[in-house]
Amino acid sequence: MGNKINPNGFRLGITRGWNSRWYAGKKQYAGLLKEDEKIRKLVDKKLSAAGIARVEIERAGQQVNVIISAAKPGIVIGKGGDSIKQLRADIEKLVSAGTVAVNVAEIPNPNISAPLVALRIAEQIERRFAFRRAMKQAAQRVMESGARGVKVVLSGRLGGAEQARRETVREGRVPLHTLRADIDYGTALARTTYGILGIKVMVFTGEVIGGRTETIARPQRRNDERRPEGGDRANRRRPTARRRAGGE
């Protein structure tokens, strides 16, 4: 179950919130849902260089609030705010009614943001990097940035092989069934000459206890507690020939 379900949907309402927050009747619901999808596609297309991790949409009456979480907020805002003004004008054309407000939130640590890690791997593969090297480097970068665990899954015609397969790189601990685990999940597509590769990334940063994420310290052994090479068998003495003879 934990391997198949979307980690964000599995923890929705527990450690994860909704990306679209609004209420609508049965007749308006489908139309507003399509508008949200168009807004997200527009943001991803126009601001692909800004490192967009998440687009949240809030609706209250005739007000539409779009919150963009980006690794490079300066690209979203633009020089003198020109880019964000143009983006707001484009979004207003997609919205049926109401005024639009666009807010930008900076991601403090992009290296542990799963959507951004997946996008970085996809860009490297599209530039003909070795896929194993890209996966391992991304996992190491995530662990060095303070994450407790990371899992990267790459599927498709890896290396141009005739038969599609899947490869996984895992570092640290990534709990799949612990609902209080703070797991960030992101996907991306790498379009290559031999087909499309799918990338999934899960980043575990700690457990949410009392409304805040608490990191779990890794168990460490002291120097005097470390076992010698060979385990307990190295400390066992073999009986000498004289002792064996005396025992007989």
From Swiss-Prot:
Record Pfam families: KH_2 (PF07650), Ribosomal_S3_C (PF00189)
Region (Disordered), start-end ranges: 214-248
A molecular function GO annotation: rRNA binding
Alphabetical UniProt keywords: Ribonucleoprotein, Ribosomal protein, RNA-binding, rRNA-binding
InterPro entries linked: KH_dom (IPR004087), KH_dom-like_a/b (IPR015946), KH_dom_type_2 (IPR004044), KH_sf_prok-type (IPR009019), Ribosomal_S3_C_sf (IPR036419), Ribosomal_uS3_bac-typ (IPR005704), Ribosomal_uS3_C (IPR001351), Ribosomal_uS3_CS (IPR018280)
Domain KH type-2 intervals: 39-108
Coiled coil recorded as keyword: no
Superkingdom of the source species: Bacteria
Basic residues bias (residue ranges): 235-248
One GO cellular component term: cytosolic small ribosomal subunit
GO BP term, pick one: translation
Presence of keyword Metal-binding: no
PANTHER family: 30S/40S RIBOSOMAL PROTEIN S3, SMALL RIBOSOMAL SUBUNIT PROTEIN US3C
Subunit structure: Part of the 30S ribosomal subunit. Forms a tight complex with proteins S10 and S14.
Cited function: Binds the lower part of the 30S subunit head. Binds mRNA in the 70S ribosome, positioning it for translation.
Sequence similarity: Belongs to the universal ribosomal protein uS3 family.
UniProt name for this protein: Small ribosomal subunit protein uS3
Species name: Deinococcus deserti (strain DSM 17065 / CIP 109153 / LMG 22923 / VCD115)
